[in-house]
A protein has these predicted regions:
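Electropositive, glycine-dotted interaction segments
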Residues: 109-220
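Intrinsically disordered, low-complexity boundary segments flanking structured domains
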Residues: 4-8, 79, 150-154
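Short, mixed charged/polar active-site loops
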Residues: 14-16, 98-102, 130-131
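Conserved P-loop NTP-binding catalytic core
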Residues: 41, 47, 51, 60-111
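Generic "edge-of-domain/loop-turn" microfeature
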Residues: 12, 26, 97-99, 112, ...
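Pre-Walker A-like glycine/lysine-rich segment at the N-terminus of P-loop NTPase domains
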Residues: 1-64
Length: 220
């Protein structure tokens, strides 16, 4: 379940944009639209409205790019045309296996390399206090490397940056890295993006005719 999306220097976005699904529990009007899990309160559904060319479609494209990166698919990320910066920044916070996690990465469009990765677990107690536990961090630019698995830090600087780190090595030998990989892949496989423009007009007409009670089947 998506909790937050973070975008910077991607497509139309030339500065950081944060889309949050965290529910404001002070507002009781839409309490039925709140999913509660392990002290986290997340909106079940949200809508994005705005005029043309404000980034709505590109926002969804960024979610697709995050999914593609997590599933080791070729990246088509593009940096903003009006900034002298080829580095795209994306991040996502999500619920998976009744826990909240955060993953951020930076992709250099020119070099086609992932120059930054950071995975953390967000732990929240019954009083609303949060703490972040970092599992993995790889910062190529600043040469900062960390992994909760012992003896893995020394490997990080010498591994290729062509894909996310957990696709570069056999993770089964490392407890935290292997669990991180399973969490991210499991979550990414649950992201579904429906493009309404790709629905054939013929299918729409058949549905309107309600042949063989198609409308009832869709409602079911």
């Amino acid at each position: 379940m998506i909790v937050e999306i973070r975008i910077n220097n991607c497509y139309i976005f030339n500065q950081e944009v944060v889309f949050s699904m965290n529910a404001d529990m002070r507002n009781k009007r839409f309490i039925t639209n709140v999913h509660k899990e392990n002290n986290f309160n997340i909106l079940k559904a949200a809508g994005i409205y705005g005029s043309n060319n404000t980034g709505k479609t590109r926002f969804v494209k960024c979610i697709a790019d995050i999914k593609n990166a997590l599933l080791n698919r070729k990246s088509r990320l593009m940096s903003n045309l009006f900034t002298d910066n080829s580095i795209c920044e994306l991040g996502i916070t999500f619920l998976e296996f009744n826990r909240e996690f955060s993953f951020d990465f930076k992709f250099d469009e020119n070099k086609e390399e992932y120059i930054y990765e950071c995975f953390s677990e967000i732990i929240k107690d019954q009083y609303g206090n949060e703490r972040t536990q970092c599992w993995f961090k790889k910062d190529v630019i600043n040469k900062e490397y960390y992994c909760a698995d012992e003896n893995l830090d020394t490997m990080l600087p010498v591994i290729s940056n062509n894909s996310l780190f957990f696709y570069q090595i056999d993770t089964t030998k490392f407890k935290y890295l292997d669990e991180m990989k399973k969490i991210l892949i499991s979550f990414a496989n649950k992201i579904d993006i429906v493009n309404m423009n790709n629905i054939p007009i013929k299918h729409t007409i058949e549905l309107m005719k309600n042949k063989n009670n198609l409308q009832n089947k869709i409602v079911e």
